[in-house]
Amino acid sequence: MSRMAEQQLYIHGGYTSATSGRTFETINPANGNVLATVQAAGREDVDRAVKSAQQGQKIWAAMTAMERSRILRRAVDILRERNDELAKLETLDTGKAYSETSTVDIVTGADVLEYYAGLIPSLEGSQIPLRETSFVYTRREPLGVVAGIGAWNYPIQIALWKSAPALAAGNAMIFKPSEVTPLTALKLAEIYSEAGLPDGVFNVLPGVGAETGQYLTEHPGIAKVSFTGGVASGKKVMANSAASSLKEVTMELGGKSPLIVFDDADLDLAADIAMMANFFSSGQVCTNGTRVFVPAKCNAAFEQKILARVERIRAGDVFDPQTNFGPLVSFPHRDNVLRYIAKGKEEGARVLCGGDVLKGDGLDNGAWVAPTVFTDCSDEMTIVREEIFGPVMSILTYESEDEVIRRANDTDYGLAAGIVTADLNRAHRVIHQLEAGICWINTWGESPAEMPVGGYKHSGIGRENGVMTLQSYTQVKSIQVEMAKFQSIF
């Protein structure tokens, strides 16, 4: 693909130049080519976007629930009509295989938007009787202008996960995509406008997180920030949001999730789940089950099943339908993952497979890392303690149920967890003891629109998806009505 035209900001229903004068490049990680130069939003641009959003939000919130629902449903239809076009752009920007982006990224994002479009008419208050002459009623009102700050691994899906409940509740959103993968969020803004969303209700500000993101978190005109990213960045976003104007926050942060295989499990099923929990999207999924706990007596057989499945990984032309494994999202990220792999070797973990740059026809210029499996791992190793966010699985052995529960919970993270077992009683007994917000039994990775997702401990605050997320984009107003004559003591 030839280099795209310079990308601008999207404010008040159209493209506009950034006042900052700064730009950055977005790179195709499959081959190292520059996709586009992108303008970076500065402080004045954030001010413009907030003013625009405030204007648009008043119009949007004044519409009836059914009017808002129809507009969002129209956007869903456009997303599905342009699925392949958007998936190709997502593949170019992220490096993910087209077989993945065309069946997951836009599809699941559109599902969430459709889900919230359907929930809009259900937003309602309550009536509380006090006595014969008095009652209270409540209203759920929008927060106003909210900000979404996205991560680079699922650009358009995250933009939809954040904007769908926010818009459904009557808010306007200013969205800052990751500077690594900014392109499809701009296309989403076009689609919202085409569907009939009032100008200003969804503005997109590409830019560097340390600048544009900070301006958003500090701006007094923004009522809430929803952030997806790393723990360290999330803590800064939360601190800035609270210090500036006590903003509400939703934080979807990192994980180092345990996948526990029990001795009664079907090892073929367990190996299939472990592969998806580590190598789907080249391991760049926040919920990945990178700590795979296996009974010591089953480990040798489990390792052989993993090796057999690694042979089925197909890296190569990301637009080939047979390719199921792409490069990492950027060269700096590739180098960081390689540093973790080197650390694993240094600390004594045994490389079962991979462990280096992936080379071959058409791969040499991209940010490729071989699917890597470490075994003979221990809990104190860096690769077991820290989030790598790449195609790196760590296999750990254990002897008892109590031991594996304790070790699985021995982490600052608490995003996800899963178990593989044939014993239903054990499944529920163990899953109830795991300190994680998203849990799976005999499966991994699905996050449907109806399912609240979010973490315990350092993995986040609040939830995305599900009914409760729609409510989190509202504030409750209580109104007392007195029908008898008011009595004053004065």
From Swiss-Prot:
K(+) 1 binds at residues 26-27, 93, 180. Binds 2 potassium ions per subunit. Transmembrane segments: none annotated. It catalyses: betaine aldehyde + NAD(+) + H2O = glycine betaine + NADH + 2 H(+). It comes from the Bacteria. Involved in the biosynthesis of the osmoprotectant glycine betaine. Catalyzes the irreversible oxidation of betaine aldehyde to the corresponding acid. This is Betaine aldehyde dehydrogenase.
